[in-house]
């Protein structure tokens, strides 16, 4: 009986065996990512692929200042509206800024033909050389060049006219046929602008040009048009019943443009030799211009980001991330972040068999925790960690490189008569945007799934590496841990970690301890059976005695009557 009690005592005594556990890193990160199967998975490390912030400023682009048109628009700037005199010397820019109240355009009412196409052309121009194409003093000796002014284009309270055009009228009582040519020798394309005046009455036609049946002809190798004044009564706009239509063309190097007219010509005074080849553009923004520099500008503000995607604004100028509709694009680089719960022990589930990470292991993603007579501690597995870091870093860089197509995306220009085309274009652009957004989100979801599976696989591989070394010299006790059947000092623990564990060296000790433990288990089973019988009999006796005592008490006070019949 004494021997059995000793064995029973052993079964309730915790024997502190040496152990080694495989685990993974955890930290206090709150980063969450989405995968194909899950949303908001907390991870230890991640990288953001989506820029969602800006500085609220309009900045220089790569050191080149933008051109702020203020209250003027492109038409007013190029024609030379007197209200835009501050822009007369502007000849270079990184991009052009119009504001929501850029209303000073054509001061004399009329239509600017193909104006949207001209604005589109400016997207590839960042500077020009402004020059006199037909000098005012010498080009028109037989015509008047000083009386062509109007209250619609007033300056300082007096009638004036566009700074880059000349309103040619009759001299005395005649308007002789004029013919003037210019040959482009600038070595680049030249932008030429002119106009045609349409008076409201025949009397005004004769008053200005003398000739009732006047015409204007403009021709080059690529452009050839003949205009006749459309004389008609019209409602007044800016005090004018007449109209002026404005035209433009690009003159190639070596090409010649000829103007011929017998009246109604608004002649070019200045032209522009264009420097093409760089990405520019026109944006509409009320943001302030600051002394700052950026590589990417949006109407809302500048982006200083190397990320492949942004959701700030679809219109961008410079080297900009691709616009997507997404609100979150975060790529996992680390592991699932599930710190172990202390009441559960060190582990809590990655890879399906380990239920929590270690915040105490800070020098690697995967590693070990050991405990023996010399103490306990964490140690990262540097090789598997470094291989994982290299692989994931390469993958992230590859994704960013493939998706990080930096470019300018300016809005397309449409006039009021092209609304159906504009609406169709918006639908097409929205379709492309939806595809881009879907592709970006799907890419991130798939890569996050692969990354987390990759980490799970690495932890499993590390576990299998330990298991294959220890074999039956230790037993699996769950949660990624092994309990040794032999004493394993720090040197022994280190050999397990670095893959040099000497199985034969410890196999004999392990065999003896394993057999002893198995014997204790068998004896314990016999003791448990005896205890079970004793417990059953004792319980029955207690119940029987209790029932008898209660019955005797009830008979003695008359609560229970007992009759014995023979």
Swiss-Prot record:
Residues 551-566 are cytoplasmic. The record marks 344-345 as: Cleavage. It is found in: Virion membrane; Host apical cell membrane. InterPro entries: Capsid_hemagglutn (IPR008980), Hemagglutn_HA1_a/b_dom_sf (IPR013828), Hemagglutn_influenz_A (IPR000149), Hemagglutn_influenz_A/B (IPR001364). Keywords: Clathrin- and caveolin-independent endocytosis of virus by host, Clathrin-mediated endocytosis of virus by host, Disulfide bond, Fusion of virus membrane with host endosomal membrane, Fusion of virus membrane with host membrane, Glycoprotein, Hemagglutinin, Host cell membrane, Host membrane, Host-virus interaction, Lipoprotein, Membrane, Palmitate, Signal, Transmembrane, Transmembrane helix, Viral attachment to host cell, Viral envelope protein, Viral penetration into host cytoplasm, Virion, Virus endocytosis by host, Virus entry into host cell. Gene3D superfamilies: 3.90.20.10, 3.90.209.20, Hemagglutinin Chain A, Domain 2 (2.10.77.10). The keyword Membrane applies. GO terms for molecular function: host cell surface receptor binding. Glycans are attached at residues 27-28, 40, 104, 304, 498. The chain crosses the membrane at residues 530-550. GO terms for cellular component: host cell plasma membrane; membrane; viral envelope; virion membrane. Homotrimer of disulfide-linked HA1-HA2. Interacts with human CACNA1C. Major glycoprotein, comprises over 80% of the envelope proteins present in virus particle. The extent of infection into host organism is determined by HA. Influenza viruses bud from the apical surface of polarized epithelial cells (e.g. bronchial epithelial cells) into lumen of lungs and are therefore usually pneumotropic. The reason is that HA is cleaved by tryptase clara which is restricted to lungs. However, HAs of H5 and H7 pantropic avian viruses subtypes can be cleaved by furin and subtilisin-type enzymes, allowing the virus to grow in other organs than lungs. Belongs to the influenza viruses hemagglutinin family. Binds to sialic acid-containing receptors on the cell surface, bringing about the attachment of the virus particle to the cell. This attachment induces virion internalization of about two third of the virus particles through clathrin-dependent endocytosis and about one third through a clathrin- and caveolin-independent pathway. Plays a major role in the determination of host range restriction and virulence. Class I viral fusion protein. This is Hemagglutinin. It comes from Influenza A virus (strain A/Duck/Alberta/35/1976 H1N1). The lineage of its organism: Viruses, Riboviria, Orthornavirae, Negarnaviricota, Polyploviricotina. The gene is HA.
